[in-house]
């Protein structure tokens, strides 16, 4: 009986350790027009690869094992990018283009899977996250907004630290970044009793959306990285 209780405790703990990430990519990208008219904004090249690959790499480096794309019918190229293309791989093999072959087969590590779910209507971020509920189930998860690329050269990235904190405390986490005081009216700003040190966390009392300059509770802006469960969302 004691061993059954212990097993149950392990099962519950594993259930609430984050291994899944939701990436909402169904938006039409109107801010990126006219480029996004034919190319999804997430597929716009940054240096030498699509922007969304950097976000997926960030998630994988943080220990994520399943990427859930909440997508739209116009975003098939995103799904295709993370899928295997055996015809292309065979062609590269025949032409002995080994470097290119290695590059495309390593876009997604073998231990990581990508699944897609459609968001039938553009009803916002909360709705996009709910669209993935059947896949996530009762597990905790991360949400990464692909509009934001987080530059992080540390051995353990900020997302990994945030997920680690969630796994220990089971308290919802939101990643923030300090912005100049005169720009607070362009962001969602968190209300905290005291600003946390870099890489640390602090209790949050609320979020003020685009407060007027001079009225913001802090200069810490939300940057599109969350660690939560559907229990938190129901609350």
Which residues does each PLM region occupy?
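Short loop/turn motifs at secondary-structure junctions
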Residues: 1, 17, 63-64, 137, ...
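Conserved small/polar residues in nucleotide/adenosyl-binding loops
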Residues: 1-9, 231-235
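Residues marking helix boundaries in flexible regions
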Residues: 11-13
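N-terminal glycine-rich phosphate-binding loop and ensuing alpha1 helix
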Residues: 16-100, 114, 155-157, 161
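Structural motif
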Residues: 20-22, 67-68, 114-115, 140-142, ...
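Conserved beta-loop-beta/alpha segment of the NTase-like Rossmann-fold superfamily
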Residues: 88-90, 103-194
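Catalytic-core segments of class I nucleotidyltransferases/pyrophosphorylases
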Residues: 142, 154-159, 163-167, 194-234
């Amino acid at each position: 009986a004691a061993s059954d209780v212990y097993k149950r405790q392990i099962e519950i703990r594993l259930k609430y350790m984050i291994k899944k990430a939701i990436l909402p990519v169904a938006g039409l990208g109107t801010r990126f027009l006219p480029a996004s008219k034919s190319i999804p904004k997430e597929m716009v090249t940054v240096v030498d690869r699509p922007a969304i690959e950097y976000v997926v790499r960030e998630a994988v480096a943080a220990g994520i094992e399943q990427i859930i794309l909440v997508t739209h019918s116009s975003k098939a190229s995103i799904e295709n990018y993370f899928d295997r293309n055996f015809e292309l791989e065979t062609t590269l093999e025949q032409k002995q283009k080994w470097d290119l072959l290695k590059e495309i087969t390593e876009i997604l590590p073998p231990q990581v899977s990508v699944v897609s779910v459609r968001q039938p209507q553009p009803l916002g971020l909360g709705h996009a996250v709910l669209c993935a509920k059947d896949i996530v189930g009762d597990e905790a998860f991360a949400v990464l907004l692909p509009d934001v690329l987080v530059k992080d050269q540390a051995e353990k990235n900020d997302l990994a630290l945030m997920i680690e904190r969630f796994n220990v405390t089971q308290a919802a986490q939101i990643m923030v970044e300090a912005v100049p005081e005169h720009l607070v009216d362009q962001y969602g700003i968190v209300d905290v009793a005291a600003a946390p040190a870099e890489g640390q966390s602090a209790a949050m009392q609320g979020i003020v959306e685009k407060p007027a300059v001079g009225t913001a509770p802090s200069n810490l802006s939300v940057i599109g990285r969350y660690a939560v469960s559907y229990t938190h969302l129901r609350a």
